[in-house]
Curated annotation (Swiss-Prot):
Class of enzymatic activity (EC top level): oxidoreductase
Species the sequence originates in: Haemophilus influenzae (strain ATCC 51907 / DSM 11121 / KW20 / Rd)
Protein family (similarity comment): Belongs to the QueH family.
Superkingdom, taxonomy of origin: Bacteria
HAMAP family, per the entry: QueH
GO BP, one annotated term: tRNA modification
Protein name as annotated: Epoxyqueuosine reductase QueH
Gene name of the record: queH
Enzyme Commission number(s) of this protein: 1.17.99.6
Length: 245
């Protein structure tokens, strides 16, 4: 069952100054971060943002806020395993949304459905067909919610991570939106203009939980296998957070 958190908008000390696209991003991390002004497709000004976690969505949220776009966060990620990891990632995302008064849609943790769809793909590599299935599943729900609740545009913060295949993600987003005449998928490149680096800076500033694998049980398995082979300690759920230094 979906629930909405619509906390009162609070003022923030963060510099959300937006500038025209021709302006360059300043390189000094201690200087005010000057952004390009974003525009939604077809002149729309209402957006549904599918979010996977606070670190990936932090820069995306601040960029959207800087441009004065009305948006709501949609958290639907049944792939995340185990439940403890899922809850930590969700609560971190809620914490950041509350800071700026952003509505947050907490969608169902439809874990069994995800496992059913993943059958036969348990040993597929990262960025393979299992990941396509996972993006399809999440974006199908996001597009459906956008259609039912009057959001003409939806997008996702998934593509900001350099661990992901942006073309794969965008293909899934467009495929989900094609089912509805009144929904557009916005395939904005969140990595450009220093977006990926800014993502890390915000994560450190906010001291977000630092997840060490993509999210699903198979990603956790493969990450721990690599760690074992390279003499590293296995992942401990809920332990690692970004530090300011």
């Amino acid at each position: 069952m979906n629930t909405e958190l619509q906390p009162k908008l609070e003022k923030s000390a963060v510099n959300f100054q937006a500038k025209p696209r021709k302006q360059k991003i300043r390189k000094d991390p201690n200087a005010p971060f000057i952004r390009e002004k974003l525009e939604l497709p077809d002149g729309h000004n209402k957006l549904l943002l599918h979010s996977c976690c606070a670190p990936c969505s932090g820069e995306v949220m601040e960029a959207i806020l800087a441009s004065g776009i009305e948006f709501t966060i949609y958290f639907y990620n049944p792939n995340i395993h185990p439940l403890k990891e899922y809850l930590i990632r969700k609560e971190e995302n809620i914490r950041f949304a509350k800071k700026f008064g952003i509505p947050f849609i907490d969608a169902d943790y439809d874990r069994q459905n995800w496992f059913d769809r993943a059958k036969g793909m348990e040993w597929e590599p990262e960025r393979g067909i299992r990941c396509t299935m996972c993006f399809d599943m999440r974006f199908e729900k996001a597009a459906e919610y956008a259609h039912k609740h009057g959001f003409p545009v939806f997008t996702s913060c998934l593509g900001i991570s350099r661990w992901k295949d942006m073309n794969q993600i965008n293909g899934c987003g467009h495929r989900a939106a094609e089912k509805y005449d009144d929904v557009i998928y916005w395939d904005y490149n969140w990595r450009k203009e220093g977006g990926s680096q800014r993502m890390i800076e915000i994560s450190k500033r906010e001291r977000f939980y630092q997840q060490e694998y993509c999210g699903c049980v198979y990603s956790l398995r493969d990450s721990n296998k690599w760690r074992e082979e390279t003499g590293r300690q296995k992942i401990e759920i809920g332990k690692l957070y970004y530090s300011a230094d």
